[in-house]
Regions:
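Mid-to-C-terminal alpha-helical segments outside catalytic/metal-binding sites
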Residues: 2-30, 34, 40-80, 106-112, ...
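Active-site neighborhood of phospho(di)ester-bond hydrolases with catalytic His/Asp-centered motifs
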Residues: 32-34, 84, 121-122, 149, ...
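Histidine-centered divalent metal-coordination motifs
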Residues: 35-37, 181, 231
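Active-site environment of divalent metal-dependent phosphoester hydrolases
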Residues: 39-42, 88-91, 127-128, 156, ...
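A short secondary-structure junction motif
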Residues: 45, 95-96, 241-245
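Short, basic, glycine/proline-bearing loop/turn elements
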Residues: 51-57, 152-153, 262, 266-269
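Active-site gating/metal-coordination segments in enzymes
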Residues: 79-210, 216
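H/E-rich (His + Asp/Glu) clusters that bind or coordinate divalent metals
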Residues: 188, 195-214, 221, 226-338
């Protein structure tokens, strides 16, 4: 009996020691963050002034280091962050294309130095279509990028413009994941004095971008591209009925009915970055199934603390949260599967 008692005590001690690890394994969501940014030092030399002038969060952005990302990832259960760099390369002058290449190579080294913690969307120097095609091939073939990152507009052109067709045709052939990040269009970056462009214009440019692509038939002509749009699709969920109704009567859009146009929007992917208020998530969940939602943080512009609490409190089931936090991204990025 004494021997059995000792065994029982030892077993109890082992179980007690393992309990915290088991609890962590059950609660750690192992998130995949599809909306995460890097700011390489060599690029900040060129963009620091513009960032400080345009973003209320620029002080955190210019202080970015990989270690800061990893610290936030540890705090918020993010296993892998897929980084992107939504820079206007053409605004950087003659060496913009070279800086784009250096940024892609930097991202590839970051992924190699921290295996399993980072992926990246390759940048391309649009609106130079030939250079963008060349850089996309380099990023995907040589650097093994997880996808390609674009922005919602380039000057006065949105991705529904024919300018983008050669790039989309190639990315469709490759069945690429394309992440499209908001920016302020040339017309509207200072539309309302005193209000930073990210406050409103970024959100409406996401909506303009999707609308331009829908009306031009981009999603139907390039069905093998998996598109990710940000911030719950911005104003799209609230305007989807109006947009698809109008798209259905514009002959060039190629839809025979509003329902056909709506089905296209429901197949797109949307990150829930910093858009986890009850009204925002309710609107998105009304538009698309949970299978189309992805986790994102927007670090270092914002922190996971701006997204996670609202997501956790919304009322998703455990299975739905697992899909948003990780499972849906695993389907888009098979190398990240556990």
């Amino acid at each position: 009996m004494e021997t059995m008692s000792r065994r029982a005590v030892l077993a109890g001690l082992v179980a007690a020691a393992a309990a915290p690890a088991l609890a962590q394994a059950k609660t750690n969501p192992r998130r995949i963050d599809v909306h995460h940014h890097s700011e390489p030092p060599f690029l900040l030399e060129r963009t620091r002034a513009a960032l400080l002038a345009s973003s209320p969060y620029a002080s955190d952005v210019v202080a970015w280091t990989p270690e800061r990302s990893l610290d936030q990832m540890e705090q918020w259960g993010i296993e892998t962050a897929i980084i992107s760099n939504p820079t206007n390369w053409s605004a950087l002058g003659a060496d913009g294309n070279a800086l784009c290449r250096r940024t892609n190579e930097y991202a590839a080294r970051l992924r190699a130095d921290h295996k399993g913690r980072f992926g990246f969307f390759g940048s391309v120097p649009l609106p130079d279509t030939d250079a963008a095609l060349s850089e996309a091939a380099y990023a995907l073939d040589r650097l093994k990028a997880d996808g390609i990152g674009l922005v919602t507009s380039y000057g006065d052109k949105w991705p529904g413009d024919p300018l983008f067709d050669p790039l989309f045709a190639e990315l469709n052939r490759r069945k690429t994941v394309v992440f499209i990040h908001p920016t302020a269009p040339g017309c509207c970056s200072r539309l309302i004095p005193g209000i930073p462009a990210p406050t409103v214009e970024f959100m409406f440019d996401v909506t303009r971008c999707i609308t331009s692509m829908l009306f031009r038939g981009v999603f139907t002509r390039y069905p093998d591209i998996r598109f990710i749009f940000t911030h719950d699709g911005a104003a799209l969920p609230m305007l989807a009925d109006r947009i698809t109704r109008n798209a259905s009567v514009v002959r060039s859009a190629g839809f025979g009915s509003q329902e056909a146009a709506m089905r296209v929007l429901k197949k797109l992917h949307y990150d829930i970055t910093t858009s986890t208020s009850r009204p925002a998530l309710t609107a998105l969940k009304t538009l698309v199934p949970v299978s189309q939602m992805l986790f994102g943080s927007d670090f270092p512009f914002l922190k996971p603390a701006e997204t996670v609490p609202g997501l956790d409190k919304f009322g998703f089931s455990a299975a739905e949260l697992n899909a948003i936090n990780r499972g849906n991204a695993e389907k888009l990025f098979p190398p990240l599967r556990a």
